[in-house]
């Protein structure tokens, strides 16, 4: 982890930076602190308070925006939670001919508009997707051990199986 600001680079510890410094997080940083149970519980809390008591939820979390070019596209998802704190945006860039997708997450302080963090969103996206599936399985499946059906065999499939195993006893997995 490192912070940047005013041309200086400093090491950040325990996710803290000096005032005015932006925290830069790469995939390795995310992986080094990630925990399935923490992620799933954070999502559980977020989904329980998702409406923030706001009548126009779309004002806080507008529909995604997509810009398309000849060889790629850029999608933006943004949100401003009602509790204050941070607001953010996730950018997804895709170049289908190159078979490449990249993600960037930017977090800002709602009170000051200060850029707090920039994170490579590749690992975060995989973890969040799998943690959401695990939360759904935990809430919707009958109590007790599970046999999990998995589509595919890549990064997402492996992450989904690990996430479900963090909240339930998995007695088997079947490729579908």
Residue ranges and their predicted role:
Residues 2-6, 10-126, 134, 141-144:
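N-terminal ligand-binding/catalytic initiation module
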Residues 22-25, 165-169:
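Acidic/polar active-site rim loop that often engages polyanionic ligands
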Residues 29-30, 120-124, 150, 170-176:
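Flexible, glycine/proline-enriched loop segments at strand-loop-helix junctions
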Residues 133, 141-167, 173-176:
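Glycine-rich adenosine-cofactor-binding loop
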């Amino acid at each position: 982890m490192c912070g940047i600001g005013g041309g200086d680079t400093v090491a950040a510890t325990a996710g803290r930076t000096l005032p005015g410094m932006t925290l830069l997080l790469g995939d390795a940083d995310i992986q080094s602190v990630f925990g399935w149970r923490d992620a799933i519980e954070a999502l559980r809390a977020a989904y329980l308070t998702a409406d923030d008591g706001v009548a126009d939820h779309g004002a806080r979390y507008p529909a995604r925006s997509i810009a398309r070019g000849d060889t790629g596209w850029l999608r933006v998802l943004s949100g401003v939670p009602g509790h204050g704190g941070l607001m953010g945006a996730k950018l997804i860039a895709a170049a289908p001919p190159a078979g490449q997708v990249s993600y960037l997450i930017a977090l800002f302080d709602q009170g000051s508009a200060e850029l707090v963090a920039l994170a490579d969103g590749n690992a975060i996206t995989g973890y969040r997707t799998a943690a959401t599936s695990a939360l759904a399985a935990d809430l919707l499946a009958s109590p007790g051990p599970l046999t999990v059906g998995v589509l595919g065999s890549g990064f997402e499939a492996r992450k989904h199986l690990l996430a479900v195993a963090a909240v339930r006893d998995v007695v088997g997995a079947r490729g579908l």
